[in-house]
Amino acid sequence: MRTMFVMLSILMLAVAQQNESLKYVQYDTDLIPQSVYKARRDSVMNMIGQDAVAVFYAGPERMRNADVDYIYRQADNFFYLTGFTEPNALLILVPKGITVKINDSTTQTVNEVLFVQNRNPLAESWTGRRYGTEGAMKLLGMQAALTNDKFKTTFMRTLFSGIKYLYAQPVTSDVTGELRELVQPIQSFVDNVKVHNSKIELRDPNAMVHTMRIVKSSEEITMLRKATEISVVAHNQAMMSVEPGMYEYELQGLYQYLFQRQGSEFYGYPCINGAGENSVILHYNTNRKKINNGDIVLSDCAAEYRDWARSKPS
């Protein structure tokens, strides 16, 4: 047993050393261009003005049970502005500019900074490679990307100096762990502003971004069409395949297979396959009943593609 543990430890170290030299790879070739995300961030800065700062944080990781997490999905607004898919990240938009030290050497005045998890070879041997600061700037087109530890030690001293408006998301109770540690200094500043009736006006940036998201760009429409096409193919195949004696979960499995076979990452929402009396339950997702001859089967399933989802009515 001890020998096996030692061998496993050596193997993990070898993998970690290999990962240290490997950079993040984008396997997908149809992603929305980084220029589109850049234009969105610029639009936000134009709307909030020179005397404001906007802060957005990534969606929290969620635990399924014990030490098993749900597959991570980025918060919609954060993804809309960055295209970044990793957890524990923070986006700062500063229209008037802020001076940062990139790669611990080059000093530069920028309007946007993305704080990300540091590269960690051992962690990456378990969960896959991370963007890191280099990947965030190169692949996402960020003006500056710094590791999360730099935020509290460097930026909180000067970030909010001289501003009139602070656009900051409320920190909700499901924000825990590393993300909570990252955003807590901002929440403490917000709480201080509320208590001392500061001259800084607090505003929620989500409403502004939601308004932007109402109007879809040509790139988004392409993604929506792709999601729709995937869903239509799956629905048509499911209608030809369903038969008495099948179970609702078999139909669900067929949808999942057909979605992912076409490149979809997730369902757009939990898949509903209700047969017989279950067909009138609006959000039924138990999907365990046997489908009998003469049953009406209602399927409400949609593919999500690059964070967009659309469906064809069944």
Task: Please give the residue ranges for each predicted region.
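A broad detector of the eukaryotic-type serine/threonine protein kinase catalytic domain
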Residues: 210, 236-240, 277-278
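Active-site pocket-lining segments that scaffold enzyme catalytic pockets across diverse folds
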Residues: 216-263, 269
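A composition/biophysics-driven feature that prefers long, compositionally simple stretches
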Residues: 2, 11-233
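Short catalytic-site patches enriched in acidic/histidine residues
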Residues: 66-72, 187-191, 206-208, 246-314
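Short amphipathic alpha-helical leader/targeting segments
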Residues: 97, 238, 245, 308-309
